[in-house]
Amino acid sequence: MAFRKSNVYLSLVNSYLIDSPQPSTINYWWNLGSLLGLCLVIQILTGIFMAMHYSSNIELAFSSVEHIMRDVQYGWLLRYMHANGASFFFICMYMHIAKGLYYGSYRSPRVTVWIVGVIIFVLTMAAAFLGYCCVYGQMSHWGATVITNLFSAIPFVGQDIVQWLWGGFSVSNPTIQRFFALHYLVPFIIAALVVMHFMALHVHGSSNPLGITGNMDRIGMHGYFIFKDLITVFVFLIFFSLFVFFSPNTLGHPDNYIPGNPLVTPASIVPEWYLLPFYAILRSIPDKLLGVITMFAAILVLLVLPITDRSVVRGNTFKVLSKFFFFLFIFNFLLLGQIGQLHIEPPFVLMGQIATFLYFAYFIIIVPIISTIENVLFYIGRVNN
């Protein structure tokens, strides 16, 4: 027996990464998992090295970031890799979620995989927000103020919770210090959840574009799919390098190169681009408490898909109606992201409210109705044949 199979530790690696049977029909959309793993490794490693030179004291936070950029050897590379790595992490994550929605990866027997994935998504957004605040530029300060103030919408105890989060009566030194501590911790929790995600996936194996269940047409992971993953890894590194070396600030906000000033409010307070769709949902609801609930519901609504999707066929590969509404949903999500960076004025307020309604309607109304209609059509087609 090969040593990789007999050794108690290497046998785990072997069963997950080498001899793991994969469907022979999976396409390049299944490579996003390996890209997300690469992004997580980049974020953790660059974050650890940056933390060696970063000071979480509010008087020194902004200056310490500039110190990393100017004085630390290759500090500029660490900072730009970390900042752009977050953007690429979310690009891959949104594409990974879209792949799951299109191919029905949330369907039984992979419900646990989907639930753990949604938890990872929530924690990744939290880590991104906490890291954005640590820079303590102008947008970081006001972003932290706005987002933490959302907890004041909780009846009776909201304001007390906000002051507890701040460690005072405004965003101050304790706020940045505890945000940095949490920002350092959360990625390791995400890494643990990624292992759980991987373990849950290993129980039933990967799904496939055809949406069929079967263990007959499978081939080993190593050799075929490892090489296939490497192709997209190199393509990813090319695009990642283009941003890091040639356009490192394109995905950032220029106001964050101004030190945080609580006395000067920016013309518009916006989070990083990857949080804009949910920020647009928050702003589309006039009531503060309902807006906060709606924003969190926009993330957690992903968990209802295993219940609302009643289709007898997994995925949208053979379903014309589902394809149409899926791409309509993607367009609507991109529209929400665009609205999130615009000023709150007509007609963007109404557009945001309509887009928010369509976002929730897709999960709660459209998916169950369309899946039921397609079930009837499948039944009619099968009877006629």
UniProtKB/Swiss-Prot annotation:
Co-factor note (free text): Binds 2 heme b groups non-covalently.
CDD domains xref list: cytochrome_b_C, Cytochrome_b_N
GO process terms (BP): mitochondrial electron transport, ubiquinol to cytochrome c
Needed co-factor(s): heme b
UniProt-listed PANTHER family: CYTOCHROME B (PTHR19271:SF16)
Additional remarks: Heme 1 (or BL or b562) is low-potential and absorbs at about 562 nm, and heme 2 (or BH or b566) is high-potential and absorbs at about 566 nm.
Family, similarity comment: Belongs to the cytochrome b family.
Full protein name: Cytochrome b
Origin species: Candida glabrata (strain ATCC 2001 / BCRC 20586 / JCM 3761 / NBRC 0622 / NRRL Y-65 / CBS 138)
